[in-house]
Amino acid sequence: MKKRAIVLLSGGLDSATVLAMANAQGFETYALSMRYGQRHSSELEAAKKVAAALGAVRHEIVDLDLRRFGGSALTDDALEVPTTGVQEGIPITYVPARNTIMLSLALGWAEAVGARDLFFGANAVDYSGYPDCRPEYVAAYETLANLATKAGVEGDHIRVNAPIIAMTKAEIIQAGARLGVDYSLTVSCYQADDEGRACGVCDSCRIRRAGFEAAAVPDPTRYR
C-alpha cells in the first residue's frame, strides 16, 4: 500500500507545487483546504481544480470562521490589504496562528486515515515575513505532533514536510513546471475577484510576478 500524506492546499502557487512534490515522492495524497473567512472564495475554487488536476485521492474543505476573531486584513474588511510593496516586519495580512490551526486539522486527519506525513507550503525566502513559515516553527510543530498523538507516542513518527522552505519563488516555479503543475489554475492574490483575477499590487501578487520573471517561465496569472 502506498504511503499516505496530508497536504495543506490553499489554491495558491506554493501549495500546488508542494502537492505535486508529494505525489512525485510516491505518496497517496489527501488535500486539505480551509474556508476560514478569507476575503474571497476564488482560491478555494482554485484548490478544487488543483486537487483534481494533480490527482489527490480526496480533497476536504473545512469550515472554520476566523472572521469571528479578526486581527488580519484577510479576515477583517475594516483592515486594508497593503498595496505599496513588501515591507519589513510582520504584515497585516498575517492571519493569527493560521498555519498552526491548519496543521492541527491536518494532524487529526492524518491519524484518522493512517498518514504519517504532513506537507505544507511554508517558505522563508521570498515571503511576507510570517512567523509560522520559518524552519524553527516547522521543527517545533513536528515535535508537538509526536508528543500530542497516539501514533507519535507509540513510536510511529509523524513528519512535517516543508519542501520549499528554502527555495526562492523562481526555484519553486521552475520545480513545479518540471512536475507539470498548471499554474493557470492557481490563485495567489489576497484580494482576487470572484473570477480569480488578481489585483497585481498586493504583496502576494508582487512576489508571484517577480518569481515568474526570475524563473523565465510564462506567467499565466489573470490580472484585472
UniProtKB/Swiss-Prot annotation:
It comes from the Bacteria. InterPro entries: QueC (IPR018317), Rossmann-like_a/b/a_fold (IPR014729). Pfam families: QueC (PF06508). ATP binds at L9, S10, G11, G12, L13, D14, S15, A16, T17, V18, L19. It is an enzyme of class 6 (ligase). Binds 1 zinc ion per subunit. Zn(2+) binds at C189, C199, C202, C205. It catalyses: 7-carboxy-7-deazaguanine + NH4(+) + ATP = 7-cyano-7-deazaguanine + ADP + phosphate + H2O + H(+). Keywords: ATP-binding, Ligase, Metal-binding, Nucleotide-binding, Queuosine biosynthesis, Zinc. GO terms for molecular function: ATP binding; ligase activity, forming carbon-nitrogen bonds; zinc ion binding. Pathway: Purine metabolism; 7-cyano-7-deazaguanine biosynthesis. Its EC number is 6.3.4.20. The keyword Metal-binding applies. GO terms for biological process: queuosine biosynthetic process. The keyword Ligase applies. Its cofactor is Zn(2+). HAMAP family: QueC. Catalyzes the ATP-dependent conversion of 7-carboxy-7-deazaguanine (CDG) to 7-cyano-7-deazaguanine (preQ(0)). Belongs to the QueC family. PANTHER family: 7-CYANO-7-DEAZAGUANINE SYNTHASE. This is 7-cyano-7-deazaguanine synthase. It comes from Ralstonia nicotianae (strain ATCC BAA-1114 / GMI1000).
